[in-house]
Amino acid sequence: MASPASVAGGGEDSNGCSSLIDPLLVSRTSSIGGAERKAAGGGGGGAKGKHWAAADKGERRAAKECGGEDGRRPLLFRSYRVKGSLLHPYRALIFARLIAVLLFFGWRIRHNNSDIMWFWTMSVAGDVWFGFSWLLNQLPKFNPVKTIPDLTALRQYCDLADGSYRLPGIDVFVTTADPIDEPVLYTMNCVLSILAADYPVDRSACYLSDDSGALILYEALVETAKFATLWVPFCRKHCIEPRSPESYFELEAPSYTGSAQEEFKNDSRIVHLEYDEFKVRLEALPETIRKRSDVYNSMKTDQGAPNATWMANGTQWPGTWIEPIENHRKGHHAGIVKVVLDHPIRGHNLSLKDSTGNNLNFNATDVRIPMLVYVSRGKNPNYDHNKKAGALNAQLRASALLSNAQFIINFDCDHYINNSQALRAAICFMLDQREGDNTAFVQFPQRFDNVDPKDRYGNHNRVFFDGTMLALNGLQGPSYLGTGCMFRRLALYGIDPPHWRQDNITPESSKFGNSILLLESVLEALNQDRFATPSPVNDIFVNELEMVVSASFDKETDWGKGVGYIYDIATEDIVTGFRIHGQGWRSMYCTMEHDAFCGTAPINLTERLHQIVRWSGGSLEMFFSHNNPLIGGRRLQPLQRVSYLNMTIYPVTSLFILLYAISPVMWLIPDEVYIQRPFTRYVVYLLMIILMIHMIGWLEIKWAGITWLDYWRNEQFFMIGSTSAYPTAVLHMVVNLLTKKGIHFRVTSKQTTADTNDKFADLYEMRWVPMLIPTMVVLVANIGAIGVAIGKMAVYMGVWTIAQKRHAIMGLLFNMWVMFLLYPFALAIMGRWAKRPIILVVLLPIIFVIVALVYVATHILLANIIPF
């Protein structure tokens, strides 16, 4: 077994910082995002958990005996598999449940006896679908694998004694769509965390894609570059974590792991004051830009339109104007590429504020900052802009001309680097001697630091991130999840993995577009070991940059099809990963003890459901496209194909769940109505199958390192989604098939803490939308059914047989189960009253009693009028 340092990633960075397995730093994670999950027994990197065993002892022993004399790269990550004492019972239960499900199907077909035959037919179809979808979900989970980067080995291999590095280049992409829905402060904190990451400054570059073309984001990026001259050296000098200033300064008592503790308190105070001033400048930007533009426009010069938006250098902004006109509005403007910070080897090209003026001593600290570039792709109503995928492809082309790094990692603007070693961690998998050359991308789990403590709407989704994704890691690899994922540039270009790759590949303009510099960059990228210093940026080069991000550049090329991120689908991430896996590449799942990245999640129910509609609708779009897992992906492994098939059809399950969830209205029928006879045996079968699936879930909880609360929240939100978002997605898909109109892309609104003193204010705001109607109907139907059931029991208690009473209790338990699953939705309806959930606990029994009394009174009244 390896030492803790080699498992979690140890050693010291270039500034003498302690590794991230240092006890002080690990203990302090209780104050930051993700700590509660870790404390609960899960999370990410717990490789030494009692249910996991090292799976690569033989490989490591052989590598140690060789001592690196064969010239091969070292082993840079550790692999762990679930111990047989847990894995074998887990697999056995899956087979046992499969047999039980088949026996249940056979029994139902033989006993086609029901009071409502059409409902029986639909319920049998539903049960068959439940069994099929469960099997698709379960089969890929037979061999979970946890992979942990070995940062110590990476440093020994890549950080040379003379201060140079073997590390490859990384281009970091950040995408934002709108400065209103996605607050500028979030975006700039993301950029700052990237600039301060522990990676050689001359081997990384950051590209911000602004899909709105707004001047405020460019000028905010300039302000961020100025503040970075203070923030980045401060992070390096004092080894702070996390390196997003907003998150760092929210910590009540951050632990210190640097080597200049005497200076830390004073430095931290100065930087905090500078950060507060930085935020004030960001908040003032809209008014600053407006006033400046008014001044220039009032001069009545002969330059352009009278209501132009002006930059600080006295030129008109080529993007979206405050008062939009043709060619200067959102959705119609020229492409823009501006190098805010040039490559460190040439120095920075801005008159940036000198951090030494703040009385901070950075003499022993590297004060250089990575390259920083603003990109706003051109938009034109005559061309489809292809949403996020189009923005990423524009960044991919612009970065190819500027830095052309071998690897690319992308972030949504509301995420930030929470662990400064994260970029190095991903590189461990890309450079490993075993599967490194065949690894197309490394996906990290998504973690969130703005979620309410009880995670009402299952935002952490740990059943998926710590369960399903580890299972896929044992196959061809996890799917791409849209953010926090490092790609090999060649894989995005549609190049096959080494085993399948042809010799002498010649990039063609029909595939990559009509840009000589871009085609040359593709040839350079094929030489994977080469690191090239970016060319100087002159006027001719700028024109070429603006051409490759123009609205029409990828027209009649392979961009969005066989090259880059995939177009014409709402879930461009899943389909892009599918296309790459289909070429024979594999992917890896990187878990770290200290979460690599953190972000914000929609804690408002309506916003969360809108997000689910887009994801699930995009999954259905994938099924009805040429990327259908049944026919696409010629080199997909069989179980990897099964997992992708499950990702594309899971929303259909909601139709049958909705059918069952609404069935309690049958309590309103005076006579007894049974879906299946004999009813008792039917219920016993159901209970056995349900019990077995929860036993399997219990074993998954064990090896995934999650809690019962995580599992239960997943069940609850799946029920809420199955009565709202998933049926809506199915309806959208039907409309799409009939009208050829795709799923509408809607940017998820983010709440800033500055908007209110209550961090979780959005949680208690109920925004009614039509998709919530079915959920409300199900909730009311089950509340009414429970009340009617109580009333019926009061009326017929002396008449019913023991079997009838038993059947009534069984039906009542089903109603209660649905109510428990919809509990978060009931809290959402209560709004701010949900802060006192005891109100719901008291209110529901009162409603049950009222409904029961109404039923009894109605029964007595009708009995006197209409004799039975």
Swiss-Prot record:
Query: Catalytic positions?
Result: D211, D573
- Give the location in the cell: Golgi apparatus membrane
- List where this protein forms a coiled coil: none
State the membrane topology.
Multi-pass membrane protein
Task: Give the Basic and acidic residues compositional bias ranges.
Answer: 53-68
Q: Name one GO cellular component term.
A: Golgi membrane
Enzyme Commission number(s) from the entry: 2.4.1.-
Q: Where is this region: Disordered?
A: 36-68
Where is the chain membrane-spanning?
86-106, 116-136, 649-669, 686-706, 717-737, 771-791, 809-829, 837-857
Where along the chain is substrate bound? D412, D414
The UniProt similarity line reads: Belongs to the glycosyltransferase 2 family. Plant cellulose synthase-like F subfamily.
Q: What does this protein do?
A: May catalyze both beta-1,3 and beta-1,4 glycosidic linkage on beta-D-glucan. Essential for (1,3;1,4)-beta-D-glucans synthesis in grasses and cereals (Poaceae). The mixed-linked glucans (which are not present in walls of dicotyledons or most other monocotyledonous plants) are particularly important constituents of the walls of the starchy endosperm and aleurone cells of cereal grains such as oats, wheat, rice and barley. They can account for up to 70% by weight of the wall.
Protein name according to UniProt: Probable mixed-linked glucan synthase 3
User: Which species expresses this protein natively?
Assistant: Oryza sativa subsp. indica (Rice)
| Taxonomic lineage of the native organism | Eukaryota, Viridiplantae, Streptophyta, Embryophyta, Tracheophyta
Point out the gene that encodes the protein. Answer: CSLF3
